[in-house]
């Protein structure tokens, strides 16, 4: 029974990830005044499945000098971590109701750094190693602000469980009282998922394709799937934390519909940003975090810590 539960969680995620690639190509196409994919199936709707068949039927080539085991483990680990992050998300009921759901997400997302580092090192190519080092530095740096923002949210939520965020946001989205943090969180999720304008890991002019430059066929598809699964996950997490969907006990389907619509809108914003903005310079990316975001998030975190202490003597109002 538990296996069926896992399948009912993972299969829709993989289908959503497949169609996100199509939506991205369509949005980029229309923003550049062209059609995008429109040959395979009606309106190009079968394009993701055609791409998947092509990638998984190709022979997985690899350079002779690669470290075989790490070369194969890295993409597998990447997708496994991307899918396991969905376990504690309330939609409205999580697969496993973890008391420390937010900590689980933080810990698991920071493990994804290893798959990037291993893939860059195992490829035995200087381009992929440079791309991997860039990605690791960027991911670790932006995780610092994300952790501090999550800490501030926990103080408002009063629990490490993601489930209680539904109750916390019954009357008002946390986006309204904590909008500066929501803005910084959204930009940090862009950097965390290595999306434009922070896609410095795959700067074509200097790094060819980044840490996955030596990958082809199946292993490359696994990296690709992990990236898009992470995009949907980050937007789902943003929805749960800052845009708590409506929840009626008698009508849980309404929560799921609301949740999906908000996550879809945020994912579309990711694609819109990709079509609109040029890539950052690497030093600007790091300055944005260490000189702007970090002091701001620390100050806001101190504010959220001190607020309950200051208002401890004030009677609650109904």
From Swiss-Prot:
Keyword Transmembrane helix found: yes
Transmembrane segments annotated in the record for this chain: 2-22, 70-90, 100-120, 136-156, 171-191, 231-251, 253-273, 293-313
Subunit structure: Core subunit of respiratory chain NADH dehydrogenase (Complex I) which is composed of 45 different subunits.
Species for this entry: Mus musculus (Mouse)
Recorded name of the encoding gene: Mtnd1
GO BP annotations, alphabetical order: aerobic respiration; mitochondrial electron transport, NADH to ubiquinone; mitochondrial respiratory chain complex I assembly; proton motive force-driven mitochondrial ATP synthesis; response to hydroperoxide; response to hypoxia; response to xenobiotic stimulus
Any single GO CC term annotated in Swiss-Prot or TrEMBL for this entry: mitochondrial inner membrane
Role of this protein: Core subunit of the mitochondrial membrane respiratory chain NADH dehydrogenase (Complex I) which catalyzes electron transfer from NADH through the respiratory chain, using ubiquinone as an electron acceptor. Essential for the catalytic activity and assembly of complex I.
The name this protein goes by in its record: NADH-ubiquinone oxidoreductase chain 1
Top-level taxonomic group: Eukaryota
A Pfam family per the record: NADHdh
Topology of this chain in the membrane: Multi-pass membrane protein
Subcellular localization, as worded in the UniProt entry: Mitochondrion inner membrane
